[in-house]
Swiss-Prot record:
Gene, per the UniProt record: Tmco5a
Annotated organism of origin: Rattus norvegicus
Record membrane topology: Single-pass membrane protein
Membrane-spanning parts: 227-249
Subcellular location: Endoplasmic reticulum membrane; Nucleus membrane
Keywords, sorted A to Z: Coiled coil, Endoplasmic reticulum, Membrane, Nucleus, Transmembrane, Transmembrane helix
Name recorded for this polypeptide: Transmembrane and coiled-coil domain-containing protein 5A
Chain coiled-coil ranges: 13-105
GO cellular component: endoplasmic reticulum membrane; membrane; nuclear membrane
Keyword Coiled coil appears in the UniProt entry: yes
One family name in Pfam for this protein: TMCO5
Entry comment describing in which tissues the protein is expressed: Testis-specific. Expressed in spermatogenic cells of testis but disappear by the time mature spermatozoa are formed (at protein level).
Length: 288
C-alpha cells in the first residue's frame, strides 16, 4: 500500500515537473519574442530620430526628446521586467532541481522499500511494524515537501501570469507611442510638402508676372521698331521722289521756289555757304 502511494506521488511529481518545463519553455519563447520586438522598436525609434534630426526645428526636437525620454523610461521598465523574468526563471530552475532531487530520493526510498519487503519475510512482525512507522513518517515528510513545492509552483505560475499581463500592457504602450511618433512624423512631412507647394506656387506666379511684363515690353519694343522702320522707309522714298523730280522733271524747282519761301538775307547767306562747293575750278583745265 505504501509503495502504491509512493508511486502515485512520484507520478504526480513527474507530471508537475513536465508542466514546469513546458511553462519555462513558453516563458522563454515569449521572452525571445519580446526581445525581438523591443529590438525592432529600438531600430525604428533610432531611424525616426535620425530622420527628425535631419529635418526638424528646435521645438520639434524638444518634443522628440521628451518622447524619446518616455520611450527610454518604458524600455527601462521592460528591462526591469526582463530581470524579474530571469529571477523567476532561476527560481523555476531551483524548483526543478528540488523536484529532481525529490525524485531521486523517492527512487532510492522505493528501492529501499522493495529491499525491505524482500527482507520482511525473514524479519519479525515487531521489526516490520517499526519499519512501517518509519516509512509512514518519511511519506508524511515527503507529502509536506510536495505541498511546499506545489505552493511554490502556484506562486511562480501567478507571477508568470502577472508578467505576461505587464508585457502585454507595455507592448500596447509601445505600440501607441510608435503610432504617435509616426503620426507626428507624417504631419511634419505633410506640412513640409504643403510649404514647398506654396513656395512653388509663389515662384510660378512671380515667373508668370515677370514673363507677362517681359512679353509686354518685347511687344512694345517691336511696335516702336516697326514704326521707326516704316517712317524711315517712307522718308527715304519721299527723298527718292524729290531727287528724281529735281533731276529729271524740274531741275529749277529750288531756284524758283526758294526766293518765294526765304528772305533775301537768308538766300544770301545760303549762297555764300553753298557757292564755293557749287562753282567749278576750271583754271587748270583751260588751255594756256
Amino acid at each position: 500500500m505504501e509503495i502504491l502511494r509512493l508511486a502515485q506521488s512520484k507520478k504526480n511529481i513527474i507530471s508537475l515537473n513536465m508542466d514546469l518545463e513546458r511553462d519555462m519553455q513558453r516563458i522563454d519563447e515569449a521572452n525571445q519574442e519580446l526581445l525581438l520586438k523591443i529590438q525592432e522598436k529600438e531600430s525604428e525609434v533610432q531611424r525616426l530620430e535620425h530622420e527628425i534630426t535631419q529635418t526638424g526645428d528646435p521645438a520639434e526636437d524638444e518634443e522628440w526628446e521628451k518622447e524619446n525620454y518616455t520611450v527610454m523610461e518604458r524600455e527601462q521598465a521592460l528591462q526591469e521586467l526582463e530581470e524579474e523574468t530571469a529571477r523567476l526563471e532561476r527560481k523555476n530552475e531551483t524548483l526543478v532541481h528540488s523536484i529532481s532531487e525529490l525524485q531521486r530520493k523517492l527512487t532510492r526510498k522505493s528501492q529501499k522499500i522493495v529491499r525491505c519487503e524482500q527482507g520482511d519475510l525473514e524479519r519479525t512482525p515487531e521489526e516490520s511494524k517499526v519499519k512501517l512507522q518509519l516509512l509512514e513518517s518519511s511519506c508524511a515528510d515527503q507529502e509536506k515537501e510536495l505541498g511546499k513545492i506545489m505552493e511554490d509552483y502556484v506562486f511562480v505560475s501567478q507571477l508568470c501570469e502577472d508578467q505576461a499581463l505587464c508585457i502585454k500592457k507595455y507592448q500596447e504602450a509601445l505600440k501607441r507611442i510608435e503610432e504617435e511618433l509616426e503620426t507626428g512624423y507624417l504631419e511634419r512631412e505633410v506640412s513640409k510638402v504643403l510649404s514647398m507647394d506654396s513656395e512653388r506656387e509663389k515662384t510660378v506666379s512671380l515667373n508668370e508676372k515677370d514673363g507677362f511684363i517681359s512679353n509686354g515690353a518685347l511687344r512694345f519694343s517691336k511696335r516702336i521698331f516697326r514704326s521707326l522702320l516704316f517712317s524711315t522707309l517712307f522718308f527715304i522714298r519721299l527723298l527718292g521722289y524729290l531727287i528724281f523730280h529735281l533731276s529729271f522733271i524740274n531741275p529749277d524747282l529750288l531756284v524758283n521756289a526758294l526766293p518765294k519761301i526765304l528772305s533775301r538775307d537768308v538766300l544770301w547767306k545760303l549762297r555764300c555757304f553753298l557757292f564755293p562747293s557749287l562753282t567749278l575750278e576750271t583754271e587748270d583745265m583751260l588751255p594756256h
